[in-house]
């Protein structure tokens, strides 16, 4: 029996031009040293002082951990809500297949925020829904993303790889603090480039991205403006393996309903076993949980009535998803799920403008933390390309999964044979890694 892997790749690009952008860099958070008590008339013995200091430090450490955990949860929640807002903006222009990475977008824009200050920085925070975190320490946001990145990369079962490039014009003066902070928080690799030779720069950058994405995106750049000074590229590669595998032996060509009148034939995978699901009576939709190895999950949202999938998008929030998860019950089920591959590219700067992030794309951008010429810089382009592939390729899985269905019981069936939404979460952090919609599984 084969494990079904899901390959998901997201690449985000931010391009900076010399035309109009800031101030001292954020410092890493420091915990103030505990102060000695001086109000006592009699000096406490040295051992007692040490005990008190240890207790104080231990209490501070516990408070720090609790605060950090709450901040991470808030970050995940706000990133998800940002993702749902972005979904609605994309949906106004595209009613077909869709996939993008809210996590990747937030990660890249937070990295860019290291070079911004004043209203430029504030707009990015507000647009990403991150102003609610109200950081009490400098460098909080990048520190949270750094911790999350490191946690995800240590989880080898998850199969998530993330990286960042800064392609910099050879004579462009980037501040050393921006270099150092980008490396510290986002492990950014800086690559000098001659953008005046646009064709050579395009070829070299495509080579880098092709190599890092393992050939999944051989050509990210179609053209390069010779006036470009800096291009930031973030990529996320996710190759997940289902915890409950689909056996390719049972994959058959079946009918998928595009709408009330049109159907197509697609390879439909079949799985039987214990699945968690719920039915939302308010929205009349099935929500199915398909777990990956490494503590990640794909949520599949399938409307009961054909054609209602777009209407649901207006109501998607983190609170709604949390309600679905709380109401889920695990039971023996049969699941039919189509194989599909999506390859989507979006010019995100226009959508981000609509979400209130405007200044960084204008001559009023303040990027003076990025470069000494920061008030003559603006970001010209933010592009995200995401690829997802769900099929039966993979490693051997444990046999006998079908034995969980008893001979005398007809299990419930969920057949994903019409347009649906999917969300891929990392469960420990609650971070929404990818969000998408499949209207036609045979189209990219």
UniProtKB/Swiss-Prot annotation:
Localisation per UniProt entry? Secreted
Task: Look up the signal peptide feature and give its range.
Answer: 1-21
Annotated site, Essential for interaction with PROZ, chain positions: 261, 314
* InterPro entries according to UniProt: PZI_serpin_dom (IPR033835), Serpin_dom (IPR023796), Serpin_fam (IPR000215), Serpin_sf (IPR036186), Serpin_sf_1 (IPR042178), Serpin_sf_2 (IPR042185)
Q: Does the keyword Secreted apply?
A: yes
Q: Which Gene Ontology cellular-component terms appear in the entry? A: endoplasmic reticulum lumen; extracellular exosome; extracellular space
Ranges for the region named Heparin-binding are 136-153
Q: Which UniProt keywords apply?
A: Blood coagulation, Glycoprotein, Hemostasis, Heparin-binding, Phosphoprotein, Protease inhibitor, Secreted, Serine protease inhibitor, Signal
Q: Where is this site: Reactive bond?
A: 408-409
Q: Where is this region: Disordered?
A: 24-65
Q: What does this protein do?
A: Inhibits activity of the coagulation protease factor Xa in the presence of PROZ, calcium and phospholipids. Also inhibits factor XIa in the absence of cofactors.
- This protein is called Protein Z-dependent protease inhibitor
Give the classification, highest ranks: Eukaryota, Metazoa, Chordata, Craniata, Vertebrata
What's the encoding gene here? SERPINA10
């Amino acid at each position: 029996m084969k494990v079904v892997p899901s390959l998901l790749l997201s690449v985000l690009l931010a391009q900076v031009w010399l035309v109009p952008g800031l101030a001292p860099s954020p410092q890493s958070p420091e915990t103030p040293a505990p102060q000695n008590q001086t109000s006592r008339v009699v000096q406490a013995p040295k051992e007692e002082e040490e005990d008190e200091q240890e207790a104080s430090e231990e209490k501070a450490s516990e408070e720090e951990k609790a605060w950090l955990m709450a901040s991470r949860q808030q970050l995940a929640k706000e990133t998800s809500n940002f993702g749902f807002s972005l979904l609605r903006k994309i949906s106004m222009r595209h009613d077909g297949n869709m996939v993008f990475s809210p996590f990747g977008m937030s990660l890249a824009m937070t990295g860019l925020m290291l070079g911004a200050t004043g209203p430029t920085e504030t707009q990015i925070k507000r647009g990403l829904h991150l102003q609610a975190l109200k950081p009490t320490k400098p460098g909080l946001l990048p520190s949270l993303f750094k911790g999350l990145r490191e946690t995800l990369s240590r989880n080898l079962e998850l199969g998530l790889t993330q990286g960042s490039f800064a392609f910099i014009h050879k004579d462009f003066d980037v501040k050393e603090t921006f270099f150092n902070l980008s490396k510290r928080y986002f492990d950014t690799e800086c690559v000098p480039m001659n953008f005046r030779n646009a064709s050579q720069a395009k070829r070299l950058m495509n080579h880098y991205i092709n190599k890092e994405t393992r050939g999944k995106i051989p050509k990210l750049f179609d053209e390069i403006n010779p006036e470009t000074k800096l291009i930031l590229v973030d990529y996320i590669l996710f190759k997940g393996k289902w915890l409950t595998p689909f056996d390719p032996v049972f994959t058959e060509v079946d009918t998928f309903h595009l709408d009330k009148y049109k159907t197509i034939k697609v390879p439909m995978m079949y799985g039987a076993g214990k699945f968690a699901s719920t039915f939302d009576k308010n929205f009349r939709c099935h929500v199915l949980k398909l777990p990956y190895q490494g503590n990640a999950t794909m949520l599949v949202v399938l409307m009961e009535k054909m054609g209602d999938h777009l209407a649901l998008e207006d109501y998607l929030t983190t609170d709604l998803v949390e309600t679905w998860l709380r109401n889920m019950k695990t039971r023996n089920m049969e699941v039919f799920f189509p194989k599909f591959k999506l390859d989507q590219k979006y010019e995100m700067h226009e959508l981000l403008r609509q979400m209130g992030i405007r200044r960084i794309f204008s001559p009023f951008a303040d990027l003076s933390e990025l470069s000494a010429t920061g008030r003559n810089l603006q970001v010209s382009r933010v592009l995200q390309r995401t690829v997802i592939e769900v099929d039966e390729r993979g490693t051997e899985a444990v046999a006998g999964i079908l034995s969980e269905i008893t001979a005398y019981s007809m299990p419930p069936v969920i057949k994903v044979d019409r347009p649906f939404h999917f969300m891929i979460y990392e469960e420990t952090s609650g971070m929404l890694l990818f969000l998408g919609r499949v209207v036609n599984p045979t189209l990219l």
